[in-house]
A protein has these predicted regions:
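RNase H-like, Mg2+-dependent phosphodiesterase core
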Residues: 1-264
Length: 264
């Protein structure tokens, strides 16, 4: 007699009534964390700026972006960094965000509010914030290099690693040749799950936006009670949608988004 249990085949001998348990070969899909690439280029004089956003999809509040330059040496622990969506502990992602800020060569986080989102649309608002984050990170890095006399201004270059499939190029004046040039870039779909610089940017942007949402809900308890903003972060969860239907929208809602259009 044979019968299958969840993890074994049970065989009973009809003569001696011995029961033998033979483990089955169980194929379980393992959620293996992909190893993120440290660099897009191995050139030590090309400093890569990872860029990502947080809060592009919600019906509510600001969109945040971050830009990060990670060091090209063995001092930075890339194993700590992963796509911000892969963190399930608030404490852990905040610890990693602090590590990034303390050990990155340069970084910057910026945002555009819901009014700007409604005025110029979410794509352009995100691009505007990305440009701010990139240029401030670049400015910060240039100052740091000059202050420490580490490199001449023309001895290094930048390369932008942008999460997503679209980027509005940044044009700047090259003081060496007095010509307008464009910062080179690559857009990478799912980049926050491929390169640590982009993943680091995704972490900083998410932590800043989550903190903004948390502070806003503390100052305005109705946001949590009526709309569940403290937990859904402004996305279209059921409690949020039901709250809009019952109470209308707040001054922080994006009036050009989805159901919000019906309550302007």
């Amino acid at each position: 007699m044979k019968s299958d249990s969840e993890n074994a085949v049970i065989v009973a001998d009809s003569d001696e009534e011995d029961i033998i348990i033979i483990p089955k070969n169980v194929n379980r899909a393992r959620n293996v964390q992909p190893v993120l690439k440290k660099y897009f280029s191995e050139d030590n004089k090309t400093f890569e700026i990872g860029v990502d956003e947080a809060g592009r999809g919600p019906l509510f509040g600001r969109v945040y972006t971050a830009a990060v330059i990670l060091p090209k040496d063995d001092k930075f622990d890339h194993s700590k960094v992963k796509d911000s969506k892969k963190f399930h502990s608030k404490k852990k992602i905040e610890e990693v965000a602090t590590y990034i800020k303390e050990n990155a060569v340069a970084w910057y986080v910026s945002f555009e509010d819901e009014k700007t989102v409604d005025e110029i649309n979410i794509l352009q608002a995100t691009q505007k914030s990305m440009h701010t984050s990139i240029l401030e990170t670049r400015k910060q890095f240039n100052k740091k290099m000059k202050d420490h006399n580490k490199l001449e201004f023309t001895d290094y270059s930048y390369y932008l690693l942008i999460d997503g499939n679209y980027f509005n190029p940044i044009t700047y004046l090259n003081k060496k040749n007095n010509k307008l040039e464009t910062l080179p870039f690559t857009t990478i779909e799912g980049g926050d799950n491929k390169y640590t610089a982009i993943a680091a940017a995704s972490i900083l942007a998410k932590v800043e936006r989550d903190n903004y949402i948390g502070e806003l809900c503390e100052q305005n308890p109705d946001l949590a009670e009526k709309y569940g903003i403290d937990s859904n972060k402004g996305y279209g969860a059921k409690k949020h949608m039901d709250g809009i239907k019952e109470h209308g929208i707040t001054i922080w809602h994006r009036r050009s988004f989805g159901i919000c259009k019906n309550y302007v």
